[in-house]
Amino acid sequence: MLTGQFLTPLMSGFVITVIFMPLFIGYLRFKKEGQTIRDEGPKWHAKKNGTPTMGGLVFIVAAVISSIWVAIWLQQLTNSLWIALFILVLYGLLGFSDDFIKVFKKQNLGLRAWQKLAGQILGGAVFLAVYFHEGFSHALNIPLIGTISSSWFFSLFVIVWLVGFSNAVNLADGIDGLVAGLAIVSFATYTIIAFRQNRIDVAIFGLTIIGGLIGFLIFNHKPAQIFMGDVGSLALGGALAAMSILLHREFSLLLIGLVYVIETASVMLQVASFKLFHKRIFKMSPIHHHFEMSGWSEWRIDISFWVFSIICSAIYLLIF
């Protein structure tokens, strides 16, 4: 892939996002529709009440359009790319439904947990159907254990992976700019892996998302003009999991996406500790809120988490 071909999907995702994001923000402000901040969060988040949300819709559309036209141009419109786009769109639609109920229907809890889970599992099932139809390998290389070649085990794993990481990224999306920056690092890492494997189709997918996220971050850094919403975070988590599966580097996500894992673990530990011992381990969970409650600025948390993610990704790329 030549330099111009490398820059094209990146710039396409970026330009489309930068052009249409201000229009989307303007529309939501005109309609006076924005995020309702829950009382359970840090008190100073109340000033963010009414901030436009669902910005993920714009960078998802940018990624889909860019991926398809660039893939056609480079003759890389493969089924791997289609199923990656399918997960991005379906999980984005789930998040959009959740956001729509919260923002336009004024029901702050959104979709019920079982509805969201059912949609995520359905998406995973369709992903698997196409995956197996194409004859892709269902051998799963588990570190320190070995290879398991069972279609049933692989299917269960894929469902858990897609559902787990879409929700993990969603949990991490709690302060301005955090997930956008983390996702840029994660997708960049998998794009490098895709180039190493000569998987140009998957690399195109990653590059268009990175471009869209860079464009989005212009409007999402503190003080955020717009949030990505569940439409963005659920889609990004599902897309990351899909890339790791398509590149047969599934467990790499535990290191490359270690921040998401820690965010999720902090919530689980907090809930378990409170239920069992009536004590809280953290001042607030997910853990980025713990640092907020400890006096860290959002910008300091962003930079610290981004740098940590870069280090984790660099370690993986250097070792593996």
Swiss-Prot record:
The keyword Cell wall biogenesis/degradation applies. PROSITE patterns: MRAY_1, MRAY_2. The chain crosses the membrane at residues 6-26, 54-74, 81-101, 117-137, 145-165, 175-195, 200-220, 226-246, 251-271, 300-320. One of its GO terms (cellular component) is plasma membrane. CDD domains: GT_MraY (cd06852). Pfam families: Glycos_transf_4, MraY_sig1. It is a multi-pass membrane protein. Its EC number is 2.7.8.13. GO terms for molecular function: metal ion binding; phospho-N-acetylmuramoyl-pentapeptide-transferase activity. Catalyzes the initial step of the lipid cycle reactions in the biosynthesis of the cell wall peptidoglycan: transfers peptidoglycan precursor phospho-MurNAc-pentapeptide from UDP-MurNAc-pentapeptide onto the lipid carrier undecaprenyl phosphate, yielding undecaprenyl-pyrophosphoryl-MurNAc-pentapeptide, known as lipid I. HAMAP family: MraY. This is Phospho-N-acetylmuramoyl-pentapeptide-transferase. It comes from Latilactobacillus sakei subsp. sakei (strain 23K) (Lactobacillus sakei subsp. sakei). The gene is mraY.
